[in-house]
């Protein structure tokens, strides 16, 4: 069985967010998918299986800890690889069926790689935190809040607590404790700290062990929140930054359409192509 290593939200190879893509994982069990993700040590891996409809694939995304119902950069990276393997012409369109959501992705060849853009649909705006609760979350990251803006839970498939912090607060941020229960209590799965003026953000897994380089599932909520706050207009693309503090600067292109759908896109570079030696049956 073959798999590929790609870089997403990357203007060149060895930048952006790395990803392992298995283009035909039809014979793998969920247990094998989870174990392979742990073996490869990527923040996320994506496993595809072709469906009967043209350019349609089932997709399952795993972190080293669990399966996710939705993710951003794995979807874009997978679509770019599908274009490389099956697209042929300069432009293509794909439909990925995740466990709880279907996502349409447009891809095109660009420079030495690909550009992929997905429609995440409309954002769902959740709980707005009061001052005390927002301060508690900021303290959990040893960060300083930007009190000009509200902290709010927003989702385009995964619910994020969007926590505005100062520029210095973003640079100094370090998650000090597990936030699983605290986030669940407000209807969020992750926290995303953002320097509003710089359009830059950071996020960690709920345990605070691993910082993500570029988070497409957070980019949609951030874009929708910014438009709702009047910081950016609808129907006008803009870029978000992430990964600088990990030495992997990444650009995430976003746009909220007049209808309210959120588009998230970025460049994808193919890095490596490999083959598993055990058979799927040997992997369990």
Language model features by range: what are they?
Residues 1-70, 76-284:
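Active-site proximal loop and beta-alpha junction motif in alpha/beta enzyme cores
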């Amino acid at each position: 069985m073959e798999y590929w290593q790609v870089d997403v939200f990357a203007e060149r190879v060895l930048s952006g967010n790395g990803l392992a893509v298995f283009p035909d994982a039809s014979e793998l069990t969920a247990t094998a998918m989870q174990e392979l993700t742990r073996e490869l040590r990527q923040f996320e891996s994506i496993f595809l299986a072709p469906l009967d409809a043209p350019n349609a694939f089932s997709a399952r995304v795993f972190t080293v800890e669990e399966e996710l119902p939705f993710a951003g950069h794995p979807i874009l990276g997978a679509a770019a690889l599908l274009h490389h393997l099956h697209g042929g012409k300069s432009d293509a369109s794909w439909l990925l069926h995740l466990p709880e959501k279907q996502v349409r992705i447009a891809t095109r060849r660009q420079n030495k790689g690909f550009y992929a853009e997905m429609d995440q649909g409309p954002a769902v705006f959740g709980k707005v935190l009061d001052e005390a609760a927002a301060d508690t979350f900021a303290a959990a990251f040893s960060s300083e809040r930007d009190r000009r803006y509200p902290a709010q839970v927003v989702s385009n498939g995964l619910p994020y607590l969007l926590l505005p912090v100062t520029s210095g607060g973003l640079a100094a941020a370090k998650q000090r404790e597990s936030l699983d229960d605290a986030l669940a209590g407000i209807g969020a799965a992750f926290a995303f700290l953002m320097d509003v003026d710089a359009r830059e953000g950071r996020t960690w897994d709920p345990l605070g062990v691993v910082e993500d380089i570029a988070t497409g599932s957070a980019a949609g909520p951030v874009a929708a929140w910014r438009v709702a706050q009047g910081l950016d207009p609808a129907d006008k693309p803009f870029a978000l930054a992430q990964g600088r503090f990990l030495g992997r600067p990444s650009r995430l292109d976003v746009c909220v359409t007049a209808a309210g759908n959120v588009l998230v896109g970025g460049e994808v570079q193919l890095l490596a192509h490999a083959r598993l030696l055990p058979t799927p049956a040997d992997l369990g």
